[in-house]
C-alpha cells in the first residue's frame, strides 16, 4: 500500500484526465468495431489516465504477434523504449483525443517471423521448399553469400532487421461505431549484429554504420508498405513507419528512433523521411557527454554531491536522460539506499524533493526519481513538465 506525502496539493502519480473530445462523456461507451469482414461489440473506458496515453478498446485484444519483441531485442531497455517510443511518436499522426489504441491485429506471429528471416537463395531455398511445400520466401534480411567462410559471409551480409511491431489506431466512424483509422509500424534495426561461427563458439560482432542502417531501414520499410497494402483491411488507411536503432547488448541506455515516414491512405509511395533527433544519455557523464552537455553535466554533479554531503548511506546516484534536438526532455534518476528505518526514508525523500525542485525546475523537463533499497521501492518523486509542485509517494 502507498502512503502519500502531500506537498502542496498532490494527488496520484497518474492523474485521471477528462475524457477526450473524440470519445468524450463520463460513461463507458458500448460501440461496434468494424473491419472489412466483420463487426463486434466493444467498450470504450470512461477515463483516460493521462493526455499522454491512448484509451484502449475493451475487451483488450492481445497483438497477433504478441511476445516477439521480447524475444528479438537485446535488452529490456530496448524492449520498453521500442514499444513506448512508438506510441509517443504516434501522437504526431494520431491524436490521443480522437484515436483509440489497439495492439496489432493484422501481422501475426508466423508472418512477422517469416519477414524477419533471411531471404533464401540457391540450395538453402531448395532445402526450405523441400521441407515445407507451403514455404514462402519472404525474408527481409539479406541472404548469406554462397561462397566464403562463415565470418566472411556474416561480415558482408549482417542481419539488419531485428524486430517489427504493429500498433493500430481506431477512429470513430459514426456515433455508435469505430473503425481502423491508422497503423504504426516500428522497425527495430541492429546497430551491432551478433553471430557464432559454430554452436558453442564465442559470439562475434559486426558493427553496422549509421548510414548503412538508415539505407537498409528505408529499403525494408518500402517493401513492408508494399506488402501491407495487399491486406484488405490495410489498403486504405494511413500508415506511419518508424525506424529504431537498437543499442548493443552491453549498453546501459536504450537505443533510439532515427526516422519516420507517413504514407497516405491508399498509397505505397514513401515520398520523404523525417529525421528524429533523439537519444538517451547516462549520468554521471563520461567525457564525451560532459563536452556536449556541460551545463546538464554540472547540474547532475551538484545534485549528486548534495546528496553525498547530507546522506552518506546511499550506494550511488545514476540518471538516464532523454534528449530531443539536443535538449533534455526527461530525466529518470535511480537512487539505491541502505535501509535503516522508515523515518530515514521520509527524511531522505523530503530532502530529495527539495533538491529536485532546486536543480531540475526547468518547465520543459519531466523528472522521475526512484528511491530503492534491498527490500524494493521505497519512494518515488515525479515532477512533470509545467508542474509547479512535484508528486511524491512513500511506499509502506
Curated annotation (Swiss-Prot):
It is found in: Cell membrane; Membrane raft. A lipid is attached at residue 19 (S-diacylglycerol cysteine). Its main location: membrane. Residues 126-155 are annotated as: Disordered. The keyword Cell membrane applies. One of its GO terms (cellular component) is plasma membrane. Residues 126-136 have a biased composition (Basic and acidic residues). InterPro entries: CamS. Keywords: Cell membrane, Lipoprotein, Membrane, Palmitate, Signal. It is a lipid-anchor. Residues 1-18 form the signal peptide. This is Uncharacterized lipoprotein YerH. It comes from Bacillus subtilis (strain 168).
Amino acid at each position: 500500500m502507498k502512503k502519500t506525502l502531500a506537498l502542496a496539493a498532490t494527488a496520484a502519480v497518474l492523474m485521471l484526465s477528462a475524457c477526450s473530445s473524440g470519445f468524450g462523456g463520463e460513461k463507458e461507451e458500448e460501440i461496434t468495431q468494424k473491419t472489412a469482414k466483420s463487426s463486434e461489440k466493444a467498450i470504450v473506458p470512461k477515463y483516460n489516465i493521462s493526455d499522454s496515453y491512448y484509451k484502449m478498446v475493451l475487451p483488450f485484444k492481445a497483438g497477433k504477434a504478441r511476445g516477439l519483441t521480447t524475444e528479438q531485442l537485446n535488452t529490456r531497455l530496448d524492449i520498453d523504449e521500442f514499444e513506448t517510443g512508438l506510441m509517443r511518436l504516434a501522437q504526431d499522426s494520431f491524436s490521443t483525443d480522437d484515436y483509440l489504441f489497439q495492439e496489432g491485429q493484422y501481422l501475426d506471429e508466423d508472418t512477422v517471423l517469416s519477414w524477419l528471416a533471411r531471404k533464401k537463395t540457391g540450395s538453402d531455398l531448395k532445402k526450405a521448399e523441400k521441407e515445407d511445400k507451403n514455404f514462402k520466401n519472404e525474408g527481409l534480411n539479406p541472404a548469406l553469400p554462397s561462397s566464403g567462410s562463415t565470418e566472411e559471409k556474416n561480415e558482408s551480409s549482417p542481419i539488419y532487421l531485428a524486430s517489427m511491431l504493429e500498433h493500430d489506431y481506431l477512429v470513430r466512424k459514426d456515433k455508435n461505431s469505430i473503425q481502423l483509422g491508422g497503423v504504426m509500424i516500428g522497425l527495430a534495426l541492429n546497430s551491432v549484429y551478433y553471430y557464432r561461427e559454430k554452436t558453442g563458439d564465442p559470439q562475434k560482432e559486426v558493427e553496422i554504420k549509421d548510414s548503412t542502417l538508415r539505407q537498409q531501414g528505408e529499403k525494408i520499410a518500402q517493401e513492408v508498405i508494399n506488402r501491407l497494402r495487399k491486406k484488405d483491411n490495410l489498403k486504405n488507411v494511413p500508415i506511419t513507419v518508424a525506424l529504431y536503432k537498437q543499442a548493443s547488448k552491453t549498453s546501459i541506455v536504450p537505443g533510439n528512433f532515427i526516422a519516420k515516414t507517413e504514407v497516405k491512405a491508399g498509397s505505397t509511395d514513401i515520398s520523404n523521411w523525417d529525421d528524429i533527433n533523439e537519444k538517451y544519455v547516462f549520468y554521471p557523464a563520461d567525457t564525451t557527454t560532459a563536452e556536449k552537455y556541460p551545463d546538464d553535466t554540472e547540474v547532475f554533479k551538484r545534485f549528486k554531491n548534495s546528496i553525498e554531503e547530507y546522506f552518506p548511506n546511499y550506494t550511488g546516484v545514476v540518471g538516464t536522460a532523454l534528449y530531443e534536438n539536443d535538449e533534455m526532455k526527461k530525466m529518470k534518476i535511480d537512487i539505491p539506499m541502505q535501509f535503516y528505518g522508515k523515518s530515514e526514508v521520509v527524511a531522505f525523500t523530503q530532502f530529495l524533493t527539495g533538491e529536485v525542485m532546486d536543480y531540475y525546475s526547468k518547465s520543459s523537463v519531466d523528472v522521475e526519481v526512484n528511491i530503492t533499497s534491498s527490500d524494493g521501492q521505497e519512494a518515488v518523486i515525479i515532477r512533470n513538465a509545467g508542474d509547479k509542485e512535484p508528486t511524491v509517494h512513500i511506499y509502506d
